[in-house]
Amino acid sequence: MKGNKTTGIIMIFLSLVIAFIAGKEFLKTRELEPIVKGDGVTSMQKLSDYLPALKGTRGDSDIYILQGKEPGGSVLVLGGTHPNEPAAFLTTVLLVENLKVDKGTVYIIPRANGSAMSHNDPQEASPQRFTIKTPYGERWFRFGSRATNPLDQWPDPDVYIHAASGQKLSGNETRNLNRAYPGRADGTYTEKVAYAITELIKKNDINMEIDLHEASPEYPVINAIVAHERAMPISSQVVMNMEFENIQIGLEPSPPSLHGLTHRELGDYTNTYAVLMETANASQGRLRGKTDENLVLTGKDPTYVKAQKIGRLFVPYDENGHPIEERVGRHLTG
């Protein structure tokens, strides 16, 4: 009996220690990496300025506004739609901290889905964060999830019905921001975020919207621009200019029958020219090996080298991988 009590006390103590350590790690996911306002940022807004119901939630993301001295066109750049696609988020951070606008206005939302920044996809063994060395020291960044945190929106339905079109998708797509547009003011958390972004475009009459993404190397639409039909002429020009610089990039039309995505709904429901950009990210692929900080930053994975040799990929892939510098560079060039 005495041994059983001692064993029980030890097990309870160990359980508390494990719970404390795990809880501490989970609490870290609520911490946001710092974004330094560059000299080009002239003002800031919140998504709650366009939908007050988001105030005080993780969906009340910052909107950085960079306005030039001369009037001109306007563009919205979205990062963090899927926070497990780090090149998209890093591109917007670079723009916020370094871009200066002479003419027109640039709107930037680095954390389009702030809730998805606060957790990882379950059973994927993804890192919570990754670190980049800079001349000013190390900087860390969150590695999040493709979907809204269940703490903010739960449970998932068996079937997700897109409100504007009636299209039916898998139930977990209800937490995918890029299946929620144009959104609803009285909808789910994810639909409210989509609605606020749509209202931002409408009320400011933003001319162009660029949604930054990444895709796994085995995904057909990769290293490409996906454009609404009204945005095809300008997107074609961008593709030609990038090809002239020896940057291979494809151009895909937005499927009219696939609803909820930025390049479809924002083009249909607003006057903006809606486009989406994809780069190659091995850390979110299904064929990857160990998912760690090194894979996120270097894009090197021997499994994908083998997959390339047997023709299973839609992007060139060798021992050099596709590092974060290349992926961010593609977004910035586009």
Describe each region flagged by the PLM.
Residues 76-79:
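Short hydrophobic beta-strand that contains or immediately precedes a catalytic carboxylate
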Residues 69, 112-114, 280-282:
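Short, solvent-exposed coil/turn elements at secondary-structure transition points
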Residues 92-97:
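Histidine-anchored nucleotide/phosphate-binding helix
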Residues 86-87, 102-240:
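Active-site/substrate-binding loop(s) of hydrolase catalytic cores
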Residues 82-90:
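Di-metal (Zn2+ and/or Mg2+/Mn2+) metal-binding site signature of metallo-dependent hydrolases
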Residues 81-83, 183, 281-285:
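A generic structural motif
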